[in-house]
Swiss-Prot record:
Any GO MF annotation of the entry: DNA binding
Species in which this protein is naturally found: Haemophilus parainfluenzae
GO biological process: DNA restriction-modification system; methylation
Entry keyword set: DNA-binding, Methyltransferase, Restriction system, S-adenosyl-L-methionine, Transferase
Protein name: Type II methyltransferase M.HpaI
Annotated gene: hpaIM
Similarity field: Belongs to the N(4)/N(6)-methyltransferase family.
EC number: 2.1.1.72
InterPro entries associated with the record: DNA_methylase_N4/N6, DNA_methylase_N6_adenine_CS, RM_Methyltransferase, SAM-dependent_MTases_sf
């Protein structure tokens, strides 16, 4: 399927799209927190940011088909205002407030460490919208005879880890999202051959996932470097989506890449044991069970040496 990448101001590019031409919109806009996206648009004053948000959301509403859906990632500071714009100003219909939970977040010493992001799901029609539940069912936690044997409906709390440094798909973008996150939304709210849009495409996750799910993708970003990054990503080898991050359970299930494994060992295992000494034996067993056979002789020697995990690769 066709994958379009447009280097442009989002609002300007949206105005060039036809009315009622998009089946699904998924986007992670600037949160106005001063992050460096290569532009100054993430540091607007309060009213300017709301004006900017209203303008691009209004254009999204215009291009969205009558049965279409929009998913928006948004930080807590502005999410209630985005909700108001969608529901009261544009007349869209609220469907779900999704919590994306992840195990590693930003460390804080004067407050609780953030461990989730929020995603708003709105539809253009209250009842007539695409939602393919059977494409996204998850295994039942407990078996009951009344259960749907195809699996359970995912809750509105989704557990996917961040795209960490140990992930091969990591790109130099400050807010790269996991492919599996987009995969679930695209499978649920679009069909093969549909057109999916991201007005703030960043590292190109949406187009990459659309390509391998047989959807046409349109990605817009004002940063030329990000557009080039997204183009290169489309041409990269596909080995499945990063549905389960290696660090989700603290001990990766697959560390076949020796470079990643070495970095993981140096940066993570020592930290874990320093802070979880009471779990030392259990953790060592997990390491051996899950990827001991994949280790080099040097790594095995370091692991076995009196179980002293003070790894030194110098």
């Amino acid at each position: 399927m066709d994958q379009r990448l447009i280097c442009s101001n989002a609002i300007k590019a949206l105005k060039n799209l036809e009315e009622n031409s998009i089946d699904l919109i998924i986007t992670d806009p600037p949160y106005n927190l001063g992050k460096d996206y290569g532009t100054t648009d993430d540091n607007l004053n309060f009213n300017k940011y709301l004006e900017f948000s209203h303008e691009w959301l209004e254009e999204c509403y215009r291009v969205l088909k009558p049965h279409g859906t929009i998913y928006i990632f948004m930080g807590m500071k502005y999410i209630s205002y985005i909700y108001k714009i969608l529901e009261q100003d544009l007349g869209m219909y609220f469907n779900s407030w999704i919590t994306w939970y992840y195990t590693q977040g930003i460390g804080k010493t004067r407050g609780y460490s953030p461990r989730h992001d929020d995603i708003l799901m709105f539809t253009k029609h209250p009842k007539k919208f695409t939602f393919n539940l059977d494409r996204i069912r998850v295994p039942q936690k407990y078996y009951r005879s009344v259960n749907n044997m195809r699996g359970a409906n995912p809750s509105n709390v989704w557990e996917f880890s961040h795209v960490h440094y140990c992930n091969k798909n990591r790109k130099p973008h400050p807010t790269q999202k996991p492919e599996a996150l987009y995969e679930r939304m695209i499978l649920a709210s679009s069909n093969e051959g549909d057109i999916v849009l991201d007005p703030f495409v960043g590292s190109g996750t949406l187009n990459f996932v659309c390509k391998h799910l047989n959807r046409s993708g349109i990605g817009i970003d004002i940063n030329k470097e990000y557009i080039e990054m997204a183009k290169e990503r489309l041409d990269s080898e596909f080995n499945g989506f990063d549905s389960i991050d290696e660090r989700m359970k603290r001990c990766p299930n697959d560390l076949s890449d020796p470079v990643i494994r070495k970095q993981y060992i140096i940066n993570h295992i020592n930290w874990f044991l320093k802070n979880h000494e009471n779990a030392r034996e259990e953790f060592l067993n997990e390491v051996k069970t899950k990827y001991y056979k994949k280790m080099t002789q040097e790594e095995k020697r370091l692991l076995d040496k009196e179980n002293n995990l003070s790894f030194d690769f110098s």
